[in-house]
Structure formats: C-alpha cells, structure tokens
Amino acid sequence: MMNRIHAVILDWAGTTVDFGSFAPTQIFVEAFRQAFDVEITLAEARVPMGLGKWQHIEALGKLPAVDARWQAKFGRSMSAADIDAIYAAFMPLQIAKVVDFSSPIAGVIDTIAALRAEGIKIGSCSGYPRAVMERLVPAAAEHGYRPDHWVATDDLAAGGRPGPWMALQNVIALGIDAVAHCVKVDDAALGISEGLNAGMWTVGLAVSGNEFGATWDAYQTMSKEDVAVRREHAASKLYAAGAHYVVDSLADLSGVIAHINARLAQGERP
C-alpha cells in the first residue's frame, strides 16, 4: 500500500470552486479601472494566473498591450508604487466578492469523498493571499468542501508559484512520506510548474478553469465544436507547462489516480 498516491494538492479558483476562475480575473479588471482608470481585458487578466496577486498585477503591467496603454496615459511604465495602488484597490474588492464564487465545481464533492475513501489526504494552495482565503475557506466549507490543509500565496517567506513551496508546505502539514506519492492538480500553467518543481505528478484541468475561461452556464450551452476548440487550446497550454495528464475537471481525477498508482507500482516516478 505504500507505493501509491497518498495526497492530492488542489488549487482553488477554477479547480475546486469558481468554474471558469472568474472571481480573480474580473476583480483585476475592476481594480485597474478603479485605481487608474486604465482598461484591461478579461483575457489579459487571465494571462499570469497562478501568481500571487501583487506579482500578477506586476506581470499584467509588463504585457506589451497593457504597457502601451499605460505609457500612453502616464508617459512611463508601471512602477512598484502603481502596483501597490492597484493591489490596494484589488484587495477589498476581492475580499468582498470571493464568497460569491465559493460554490464547489460539479463533481468536486463526490471526487473528494472517493479519494478520501482510498485513504488519500486533500491538501490545497492558492494564488489568493491569506486575507482572501480566510473568507473563501469557510464559505466553501458551508457548501461541503473542506480540504485537510490550505496554504495562501503570502504565507511563506520563500514565496508562491511557480516555486514549489506551497505544495511542499502541504506535504509537511499532511505528513506525506514522499513527494512522488503526491499529485498537484491545477487549471493554470503556473500551478503545473509548481507541482513539477515540487517533484510531484501533475494534472491539468482543461475545462473547469482559467485557460478555458467560460462560466458554467456558458459551457452548458456551448456547441461541441466550440468546446473542442477551447479544450484543445487549454490542454495545449497545460501540456506545454509539463502536465503529466490533462482532464476536463476534478470529476475526472479518480481514473488518473488509478493510472498513476499503476505506474508507481512499476517503479515509475514523476
């Protein structure tokens, strides 16, 4: 029984809650507008997803199109003080609204129950800072999602993604004996990098999250052709980041775990 998966470490928005990862992306658009009356698109807001939120704003400012808009308005590129101001606008908006995006994605509760029935522990980490997570975690618990541990992007002095530290903090907290017995699941490329840097198996989610970028209602009414195109776009980004597996959503994870267990039994490692 030792040579098998002992823990999965799950992202939050777009992986376990908030189908399409809209809570953070919409707030970035609002924060840029509120702080400096600068417009960014939802697609631009999605590009650096997975970073801590201050670093996410910094990365947005470096996108060529956003930098061009900033230069046109202010005659210079975004400064650290500008990032601080946008972050200061972002935080209260995100804290106020994250609870509205706390419902588990379809299949999450059943999948977690199935994993726990196999003795698998449930860790989690997020690009959200602790102030946001302290609102999101209890709200998700009210809907039935309660991981065994969670780590926020600003909890650790070493930093957040794409570094391995949040994933490894879960390993420590959960008492897992080997990182090769862990699976990191994420809907964003940086979360896949995090898992790889931590020495874990990685599973990307192509439909439920940031790269697919649709609401649940929009997904339900989308044509098969549109779904296929968007799925392929998302999957290609996740595979390019190094994901060992890519599936649509967490509802598909149990079969992947069985496949990884078979590989572990044959002596394979991530």
From Swiss-Prot:
Coiled coil spans: none
KW Hydrolase (keyword) present: yes
Cofactor note: Binds 1 Mg(2+) ion per subunit.
InterPro entries for the chain: HAD-like_hydrolase_sf, HAD-like_sf, HAD-SF_hydro_IA, HAD_sf, PGP-like_dom2, Phosphonoacetald_hydro
Keywords noted in UniProt: Hydrolase, Magnesium, Metal-binding, Schiff base
GO biological process: DNA repair; organic phosphonate catabolic process
EC number: 3.11.1.1
GO CC annotation, single: cytosol
UniProt-annotated binding residues for Mg(2+): D11, A13, D187
Main enzyme class: hydrolase
Substrates-to-products reaction catalysed: phosphonoacetaldehyde + H2O = acetaldehyde + phosphate + H(+)
Molecular functions (GO terms): magnesium ion binding; phosphoglycolate phosphatase activity; phosphonoacetaldehyde hydrolase activity
Co-factor requirement: Mg(2+)
Keyword Hydrolase: yes
SUPFAM superfamilies on file: HAD-like
Catalytic residues (UniProt): D11 (nucleophile), K53 (schiff-base intermediate with substrate)
Family: Belongs to the HAD-like hydrolase superfamily. PhnX family.
Subunit structure: Homodimer.
Function: Involved in phosphonate degradation.
Name of the protein in question: Phosphonoacetaldehyde hydrolase
